[in-house]
């Protein structure tokens, strides 16, 4: 499974279950990468998501699931829980200094084979 995340200069990924910024370039990048895929999302993140056309959603719960997932799109606990299964990690670095309440996850369990891609917006 691949993962995609956006983080600002201060290490924040969100506030109140939403993004701190609205970066059109990053949103186009997100759509391009995830279009046609099956997305894994945590419940809190799901509750604030807009409709994502041409993508299926699987909402992470405490129960195990046995679906083929293409992308993990957050939130923080979902990233941390599934990070050992990431084959790719796509990180958008947003040039923004807003204070949030959710910080960049601790990916200590990434496999040695996980490829990391960085983008700047």
Question: Which ranges hold each PLM region?
Answer:
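Enzymes that bind and transform nitrogen-containing heteroaromatic metabolites
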Residues: 1-121
